[in-house]
Amino acid sequence: MQFKNALTATAILSASALAANSTTSIPSSCSIGTSATATAQADLDKISGCSTIVGNLTITGDLGSAALASIQEIDGSLTIFNSSSLSSFSADSIKKITGDLNMQELIILTSASFGSLQEVDSINMVTLPAISTFSTDLQNANNIIVSDTTLESVEGFSTLKKVNVFNINNNRYLNSFQSSLESVSDSLQFSSNGDNTTLAFDNLVWANNITLRDVNSISFGSLQTVNASLGFINNTLPSLNLTQLSKVGQSLSIVSNDELSKAAFSNLTTVGGGFIIANNTQLKVIDGFNKVQTVGGAIEVTGNFSTLDLSSLKSVRGGANFDSSSSNFSCNALKKLQSNGAIQGDSFVCKNGATSTSVKLSSTSTESSKSSATSSASSSGDASNAQASVSASASSSSSSSKKSKGAAPELVPATSFMGVVAAVAVALL
């Protein structure tokens, strides 16, 4: 097999001249045109004498194993895909790829070695159902996506300090990751990986969006600001401790974490959008949000909690729904908050196991009743239906997960009670 676009005549002549007149036959740079495709090791051997290749290189076809020798830089992208017989690949001399490193649909690939790779724009590893090892010396990258692989470790990314996108999903044998990331300018997402995934992002100070699903343990020891949305959905976390976090710019969602019994956000003062805590069956005492002062959207807290401490709350620009099945929960403090004008949206609902209070803030009528009065049923019925939608949508099937799990969502802000529920429901689809 031949390259679709072979080395340029200039590069070949350069190599020949060096072979005739020098002790080395390695040209400093070889151009492969805009792009070239290699379907055999013999094709790769033609450029093995180059320290730099210019252009986009694609490797595909029936290769049992393949290697790029001597090449230190690719001024372009390297794509390895759709090779049903490729079992291993190595390019241990490459230090820099100015474009992307793409590996996709390599069904028997067990190892990929880029031991010297320090810089790349993006790495995309998708549908690698046999891979067990992937090694790099990565220091700089903009985007990392690892999806549908059998990797047990992604330590090849552990030294990265900053990225735009870090998305690790549907890797069923991946159970732990310890990161050195300090900032994420677009999104950090972990979802549908191993059943007992343990994560540590203790150097992370700032992120734009964070969404975690199907995680067993998480540590954010230094996180201070989330510029947009923060979501913890369908996890098996026993606790959440984000004690350095002071601001979430848009929505904060803690939904369907069945084993969560403690949430500590002791320095959080501002949630810029919707704020929802829902369907966390073991979360009986919610006292870790006692410094929250403003919520820029709606607020919803539903579950079986007996204690809810929002003692610093001064302003909710949307509606409010507080619904506990525990008869030990008291609405008194929240009703006082509403009567003082802090709830600025179109409705206020507060229920416990025995009483219900519903207020249509757009009108002058207010009703309180025992055991679900008619006015409360009207106002909170839609909320119950919406919350059921949240619960029903909290997981979707994934072909590579052991259990049904959904893709990581982008959570959006809301400006009313129904808005925040609808926003989270849409996000979880």
Swiss-Prot record:
Ranges of compositional bias, category Low complexity: 361-401
Glycosylation sites: 21, 56, 82, 196, 209, 227, 234, 241, 267, 279, 304, 328
InterPro entries: CWI-Assembly_Regulator, Rcpt_L-dom_sf
Residue segments, region Disordered: 361-410
Location within or outside the cell: Cell membrane; Secreted, Cell wall
Topology of this chain in the membrane: Lipid-anchor; GPI-anchor
Main localization category: membrane
A single Gene Ontology CC term: extracellular region
Record-listed Phosphoserine modification sites: 339
Propeptide: 407-429
Residues covalently joined to lipid (GPI-anchor amidated glycine): 406
Signal peptide: 1-19
Keywords, ordered alphabetically: Cell membrane, Cell wall, Cell wall biogenesis/degradation, Glycoprotein, GPI-anchor, Lipoprotein, Membrane, Phosphoprotein, Secreted, Signal
Record's comment on post-translational modification: The GPI-anchor is attached to the protein in the endoplasmic reticulum and serves to target the protein to the cell surface. There, the glucosamine-inositol phospholipid moiety is cleaved off and the GPI-modified mannoprotein is covalently attached via its lipidless GPI glycan remnant to the 1,6-beta-glucan of the outer cell wall layer.
GO biological process, alphabetically ordered: cell wall organization
Gene3D superfamilies: Receptor L-domain
Top-level lineage group: Eukaryota
Similarity field: Belongs to the SPS2 family.
Biological role: Required for proper cell wall integrity and for the correct assembly of the mannoprotein outer layer of the cell wall. Important for apical bud growth.
Stated name of the protein: Cell wall protein ECM33
